[in-house]
Amino acid sequence: MSSEMEFSQKNKNSEFSEFKDMGLTGLANVGNTCFMNSTLQCISHTYELNRFLDKETYKTRLNKKHDSLILCEWDNLRKLMWSENCIISPGGFVNAMQKVARIKDRVIFTGFVQNDLTEFLSFIFDCFHNSICREVDMVISGTAQTETDELAEKCYNMMKLMYKKEYSEFLNMFYGIFVSQIKSKESSYTNILPEPFFNISVPISPKKTLLDCFDLFTSIEELGDDNKIFNEKTNKKENATKQILFWSLPDILVITLKRFLNNGRKEK
């Protein structure tokens, strides 16, 4: 381990020292809930989220949506998991999750069958967000002077549309923005589209490090042959390039590794 990595790890341990040697609680399987238990263990050890919930200010912002039941039941289960190191049966949380899933017509989470962990995580955090989302004021000022300013303006406008009516602390904590940039190789045509993201699904690079995976995810893609873009100004199809760029990252970045190919085979 390099000295930089050692220093970073020491800082991390010091920053979250109150969680040391605690939260080592197991969750009993209540019927094909391995995917759920794995997800809940990850959430349980997201210390920034724990600190936010420990303040309990979220309780003053709970709305009347059914999603609030998920957040409250999770907070109750989380406190039990951190009260002592033991084994707990998460029956109360499972019942609440299935009830809300039925109301929201998310049939896959209403029974006791295995499900995709990433999809379940997204469902849980959607419920968390919906529990305390509210309208806020957002003002964007200034005039774009450069290409970077124009990009910033598009991102801020997207954030305003996304945040103004339904803001919650979970957006800053878990949601970021990336930009899909398409550039023509035959004209000055450029299209920039900012998009919010909760989870980044990265391909596995031959070199197998996480940074290599991100390099592959953000690499330039050639758009030619059947994938040419249509330029409305020239009324022609043109060769182009496409690239994903990150504008802002969340406090906590959720990453999924694409371990399977389109044909269902597993990456080596």
Locations of regions flagged by a protein language model:
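UBL (ubiquitin/ubiquitin-like) substrate-recognition surfaces
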Residues: 1-268
